[in-house]
């Protein structure tokens, strides 16, 4: 139903679907992976009772900035996506969207996101420039470093300190623990994603942690995920989160164990499924946060 609704936009403009695909609105997994930790931070920063305004600002901001990130990512990769089986049919790589159009859509999405941030406070507004810089830089990092996933992790985690400054203007140590936890988690699941394209990336010279980690990939991913859970546990103690939160962490740990087991053959399909599966881990942690505050 969701996809049919998006495809119906072609009735308004014959090229609407091309721009839906460019912004990946037809593939909401990236929204989920960014949304759950951001909302968890909004809830914790609001001590379990966030304002409706902050929930809407950060919820819509996630959707818009993820779409903007996809636009600039495809712009940066437009000359290499055609050489990768999974990405050859993307709008820019296939010529359905022009580079200038992708940059225009990126600017529009960032502009609307900035209007949302203006509804918060000055400190959050200043932090938002870091979010834009990281979103813009990430796709170009694949040419120069084997750690583009770390830059993505920094970008995907930037909403966490912004959620705290929007709620009260302060950045407690626990907020940075949440930030580090999410960064580690993002590096882990995006390495699974990079493992899908590893053979193609080696041929065309694109760098990633999947290439860097080599045969130790799954073990390093699991280590990153466990470190992420450790940081969440420490953050939870600082924010007095208890049983329900810990239950959410156990659920996430079970997800990580399944991902490690299911990718033992290192085939593309299982690695991609493991990447998608991280959505459930993030959701379980968020549910744990919400229930821990709601059932006190």
UniProtKB/Swiss-Prot annotation:
GO CC field: plasma membrane
Enzyme Commission number: 2.5.1.39
Pfam families referenced in this protein's UniProt entry, alphabetically: UbiA
Localisation per UniProt entry: Cell inner membrane
Pathway(s) of this molecule: Cofactor biosynthesis; ubiquinone biosynthesis
InterPro entries xref list: HB_polyprenyltransferase-like, Prenyltransferase, UbiA_prenyltransferase, UbiA_sf
Enzymatic reactions: all-trans-octaprenyl diphosphate + 4-hydroxybenzoate = 4-hydroxy-3-(all-trans-octaprenyl)benzoate + diphosphate
Transmembrane regions: 28-48, 52-72, 102-122, 145-167, 174-196, 219-239, 241-261, 275-295
Keyword Repeat: no
Keywords per UniProt: Cell inner membrane, Cell membrane, Magnesium, Membrane, Transferase, Transmembrane, Transmembrane helix, Ubiquinone biosynthesis
Entry keyword Cytoplasm: no
One GO process term, biological-process aspect: ubiquinone biosynthetic process
Domain of life of the native organism: Bacteria
Coiled coil: none
One of the record's GO molecular function terms: 4-hydroxybenzoate polyprenyltransferase activity
Co-factor requirement: Mg(2+)
Membrane topology listed for this record: Multi-pass membrane protein
Main location: membrane
Function of the molecule: Catalyzes the prenylation of para-hydroxybenzoate (PHB) with an all-trans polyprenyl group. Mediates the second step in the final reaction sequence of ubiquinone-8 (UQ-8) biosynthesis, which is the condensation of the polyisoprenoid side chain with PHB, generating the first membrane-bound Q intermediate 3-octaprenyl-4-hydroxybenzoate.
Similarity-based family: Belongs to the UbiA prenyltransferase family.
Protein's UniProt name: 4-hydroxybenzoate octaprenyltransferase
Taxonomic placement: Bacteria, Pseudomonadati, Pseudomonadota, Gammaproteobacteria, Pseudomonadales
Encoding gene (name): ubiA
